[in-house]
Amino acid sequence: MAITVHPLSDVKASEIGDGTSIWQYCVVFAKARIGADCNICAQVLIENDVVIGNNVTIKSGVQLWDGVRIEDNVFIGPNVTFTNDRMPRSKAYPEQFLQTVIKAGASVGGGGQLYCPASPLAKKRWLEQVRS
């Protein structure tokens, strides 16, 4: 199986599993790791310190910041928001960003917000909305 990358995407990563499709206007940083048989929909950003398992679907408009870990068979709905810094300051970065883990088989509904460090989202759990 081959990897499919839309010509309007900017994909620098070399660790992408077979059967994965990356659609238009995506940006994938060089050190990101993406498993096999994933579907990365349009307008997704994936930073360097992101690990995505196998058979993962990430719908349009999602940004995966450093520290996000997504296990196998996960669905991330459109426009889901992740954060990796509780006290963001422009140009003042922590030595290491906090991790957010989405466990195998979990689903995050469209527009969901995950504040890090989130408790790992349990296996086969559906997250509709997280409120602050």
Predicted regions span which residues?
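Short Cys/His-rich zinc-binding micro-motifs
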Residues: 10
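Flexible, glycine/small-residue-enriched loop-and-beta-strand segment within the central core
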Residues: 2-7, 16, 22-124, 129-131
